């Protein structure tokens, strides 16, 4: 398998749809939230974490099955339903509309992979093993995360900062526990 090209896109204020509301869908939503996407989750049953995010106004929740047309106007889609047929229908709609989609149960239908994410302030790194080894990608992302922390701390300890006025040790956007865990 050839490696995927890493690309970083702005999701700020743009619509993203997540089909499904189980553990994988929840991880995907939590990976997308820090990047400003307007996230709609579509699923008949919803996990507690997503319920809470909806109550806090951080995501929009539609408690119903996925239906044709749900991906209209979105810039990014994730299908992580616990139903192969639903995921396949979402893939077909995304493909027809030219919408990038990650399909949790079928890497062949995914047009992108969720990377392991490492973030410290404005520095963001994504790690993938091209869908071949999720554990390797997760471990590599943890190593990159640690390197970024050390890099930022070293710069700050040497007075190199692009953020005057920020309290030492206060780095907005750091990601101590982002797993993003590469998967479809």
For the regions a language model picked out, list residue spans one by one.
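Hydrophobic, well-ordered beta-alpha structural blocks that scaffold small-molecule cofactor pockets
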Residues: 1-54
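Residue-level detector of alpha-helix initiation sites
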Residues: 23-24, 85, 131
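Hydrophobic beta-strand scaffold residues
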Residues: 39, 61, 100-101
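Short loop/edge segments at beta-strand edges and connector loops
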Residues: 43, 61-65, 105
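Glycine-rich, highly charged phosphate/nucleotide-binding loops
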Residues: 55-69
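ADP-ribose/adenylate-binding Rossmann-like module
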Residues: 76-81, 87-113
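Adenosine-phosphate binding glycine-rich loop
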Residues: 118-165, 169-171, 177
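Intrinsically disordered, low-complexity regions enriched in acidic/Ser/Thr/Pro/Gln residues
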Residues: 149, 181-184
